[in-house]
């Protein structure tokens, strides 16, 4: 199966059904990237070129050898400080105020099965389906440790990549950039394929020549966004849907991201993907670690169609979970366009009757069933059934609809709060906002601080009380605005840069608790339509 270490060549070779991925530990302990592409045998270090490149820095270990420079060598996990002036994958501020790190090889481990990422969505697999490679790296001066994680699913030609950063210094360090995956290509002319858009017009394909300099897409919005999808393809020039070689990266994450392709002075190309670095600053005390969300990699020598199929098969079989994983999803009608906020329980029942006549499987009661929610100015955060509006209990309404042979679903927007709500009046500090500044609003609402455990717990308890009232088989989880005013009562000062990422972890925690405690629940992850159409959300949906 998939992973072989050669002691004589100091190479790691990952073999999938149709591809080969190879790395090598060089004489100085740096981990070089040798090859990724069509399946092959042998050691690919002949692809490396050692030449005196003017003004390219040489590490001390290389002595007077001016042909050795990390500024031109392909690397597996490039960092700042080593003389490589291309965009790094990892950057940090050390306890003494210096920048960057110098990671050298320490050891490795190969095991059956696929690694897990606590608190994060990730591809999963049985022991016989996958293997994991862990490569241990260390900065000999500061003691910083990094574990590079590779999950290999040979049948799909998919390799997942993540990394764990561990602070062993006596004092605090601060991560300022954390990308999960990087591939350096020494040779080749490429096109970059990305997917742009806006609300109600997401994921339009754009194909751009990879010229000198950097091409960057990403999201600073706190979600993966309508504007750019966290997926990127690097394709050889002649690649079509059915022929040619191409490489894909898909980020298994639902927050801010950055995907970058950089072509350097010598025509080499670096592709990387991971967390958005703007407003990201993550301190680690001694003994603490940071896990970078994973990226799915795939390579196809049979065109873009095969690349898409690789990712689709892996996502459907080894990322999606739950009761509906292998089932046809129900056909539903949603009350929003039919009623907006103006409805009673009887209106929803009549909608279900008509749905039954049309062969529709489910009715979803959208916005307006809770608190004082009769328009979009109030009520968000108060997840208590408005029985006066429904003219009865939610449980009775669900029972009547189920008696028709129609399933029932319900809308929530768990991450949001209106200032005109009981929750906000009781806990104004639970909203993300900067003290002393009037917050930016979107759709007349603020965002709850899901980086805080007590906020997540409070919303969870409210949702459970509603879900326990009847046979609710479907939840439409909405999220109708982006993050602004990044202020938190818990994460402020030198910890303010944690908020973006911790917020996403809070969303994942709540969704994991819901699908665990309500295993028959089908969760639809809506975000104003397609602002969270990413692999991370598919893990819970």
Say what each PLM segment does.
Residues 18, 163, 287, 333, ...:
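Conserved, mostly hydrophobic/aromatic
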Residues 19, 26, 168, 178-180, ...:
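An acidic- and aromatic-residue-enriched active-site/binding cleft used to recognize and process polar
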């Amino acid at each position: 199966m998939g992973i072989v270490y050669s002691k004589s060549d100091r190479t790691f070779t990952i073999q999938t059904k149709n591809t080969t991925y190879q790395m090598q530990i060089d004489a100085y302990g740096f981990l070089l990237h040798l090859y990724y592409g069509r399946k092959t045998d042998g050691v690919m270090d002949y692809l490396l070129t050692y030449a005196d490149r003017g003004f390219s820095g040489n590490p001390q270990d290389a002595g007077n050898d001016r042909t050795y420079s990390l500024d031109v060598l392909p690397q597996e996990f490039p960092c700042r400080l080593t003389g490589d002036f291309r965009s790094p994958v990892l950057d940090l501020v050390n306890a003494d105020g210096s920048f960057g790190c110098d990671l050298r090889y320490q050891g490795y481990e190969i095991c059956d099965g696929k690694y897990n990422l606590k608190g994060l969505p990730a591809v999963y697999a049985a022991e016989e389906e996958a293997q994991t490679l862990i490569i241990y790296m260390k900065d000999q001066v500061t003691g910083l440790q990094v574990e590079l994680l590779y999950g290999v699913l040979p049948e799909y030609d998919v390799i997942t990549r993540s990394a764990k950063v561990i602070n062993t210094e006596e004092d605090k360090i601060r991560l300022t950039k954390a990308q999960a995956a990087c591939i350096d290509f020494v040779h080749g002319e490429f096109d970059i394929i990305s997917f742009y858009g806006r609300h109600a017009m997401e994921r339009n394909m754009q194909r751009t020549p990879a010229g000198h300099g950097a091409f960057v897409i990403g999201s600073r919005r706190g979600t993966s966004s309508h504007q750019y999808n966290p997926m990127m393809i690097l394709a050889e020039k002649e690649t079509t849907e059915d022929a040619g070689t191409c490489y894909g990266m898909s980020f298994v994450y639902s927050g801010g991201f950055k995907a970058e392709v950089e072509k350097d002075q010598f025509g080499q190309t670096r592709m990387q993907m991971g967390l958005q670095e703007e407003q990201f600053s993550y301190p680690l005390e001694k003994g603490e670690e940071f896990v970078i969300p994973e990226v799915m990699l795939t390579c196809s020598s049979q065109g873009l169609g095969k690349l898409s199929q690789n990712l689709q098969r892996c996502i459907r079989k080894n990322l999606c979970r739950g009761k509906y994983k292998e089932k046809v999803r129900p056909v539903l009608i949603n009350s929003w366009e039919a009623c907006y906020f103006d409805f009673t329980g009887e209106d929803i029942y009549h909608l279900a009757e008509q749905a039954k006549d049309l062969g529709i499987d489910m009715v979803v009661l959208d916005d307006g069933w809770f608190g004082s929610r009769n328009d979009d100015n109030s009520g968000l955060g108060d997840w208590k059934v408005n029985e006066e509006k429904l003219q009865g209990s939610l449980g009775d309404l669900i029972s009547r609809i189920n008696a028709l042979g129609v399933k029932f679903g319900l809308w929530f927007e768990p991450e949001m709060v209106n200032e005109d709500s009981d929750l906000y009046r009781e806990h104004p500090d639970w909203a993300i906002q900067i003290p002393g500044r009037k917050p930016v609003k979107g759709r007349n609402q603020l965002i709850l601080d899901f980086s805080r455990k007590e906020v997540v717990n409070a919303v969870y308890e409210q949702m459970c009380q509603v879900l326990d009232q009847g046979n609710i088989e479907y939840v439409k989880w909405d999220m109708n605005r982006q993050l602004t005013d990044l202020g938190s009562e818990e994460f402020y000062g030198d910890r303010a840069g944690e908020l973006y990422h911790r917020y996403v972890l809070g969303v994942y925690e709540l969704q994991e608790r819901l699908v665990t405690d309500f295993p028959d629940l089908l969760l639809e992850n809506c975000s104003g339509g397609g602002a969270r159409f990413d692999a991370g959300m598919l893990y819970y949906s």
